[in-house]
Design a protein with these regions (language model features):
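A conserved helix-loop-beta module that forms one wall/lid of the active-site cleft
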Residues: 1-45
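ATP-grasp fold ATP-binding core
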Residues: 5-8, 12, 42-59, 88-110, ...
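Structural motif
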Residues: 17, 23, 45-48, 63-64, ...
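Glycine-rich phosphate-binding loop of ATP-grasp-fold ATP-dependent ligases
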Residues: 20-22, 49-76, 118, 141-142
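Catalytic core of tubulin tyrosine ligase-like
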Residues: 79-83
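Hydrophobic alpha-helical hairpins/lids featuring a short glycine-rich hinge
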Residues: 91-152
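Acidic, proline/serine/threonine- and glycine-rich low-complexity intrinsically disordered segments
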Residues: 154-156
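Single conserved hydrophobic/aromatic residue that forms the stacking wall/gate
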Residues: 159-168
């Protein structure tokens, strides 16, 4: 099963995890309404636009952009929606971006203690168990961490049944 980032965040939020707030769009029609709502609810001044495809490395391929104002937002969303995003995890043709997540910016200018973490929950096909992989290093460059300092990536297995999600 592949989940888009926004779907994973929704599951986490339903289970009490604080998440970066945002809205998913598949066109430009609601962009002003969405950005105004995010500003009102979060106080954010900047936005992060994230292509929603089933592949990692979206930022490296140009599918994640930091936007500093509402005027720039429409231009960036327009450039990402409909693009074929090529990442290290796609074919050379890339994947068509049909949806974007417009999220509050959680990195604030001037913050010196900004820290990225990596967490992934996946099924280990060899053991048939759910595996939680995490690191205090990485996020965007987790592949590099795995290659250069694999000891910084921890793995735990769980017998817990993860929530089942039904979609119509």
């Amino acid at each position: 099963m592949n989940l888009h980032e926004y779907q994973g965040k929704k599951i986490l939020a339903q289970h009490g995890v604080n998440i970066q707030r945002g809205v998913v769009l598949d066109n430009l029609n609601e962009i002003d309404k969405v950005s105004n709502k995010l500003i009102e609810e979060t106080g954010t001044e900047w936005f992060v636009v994230k292509a929603q495809i089933h592949a990692g490395g979206r930022g490296k391929g140009g599918g994640v952009k930091l936007v500093k104002n509402q005027m720039e937002l429409k231009e960036v969303v327009s450039s990402i929606l409909g693009m074929n995003l090529v990442t290290p995890q796609t074919s050379k043709e890339g994947k068509l971006v049909r949806k974007v997540l417009i999220a509050e910016d959680v990195y604030y200018p001037g913050e010196s203690e900004t820290k990225e973490f990596y967490v992934s929950i996946l099924l280990n096909r060899n053991t048939g168990k759910n595996m939680i992989m995490y690191s205090t290093e990485g996020g965007v460059d987790i592949e590099s961490v795995a290659e250069k300092t694999p000891e910084l990536i921890s793995v735990s297995y769980t017998h817990l049944t993860l929530p089942t999600i039904y979609s119509v």
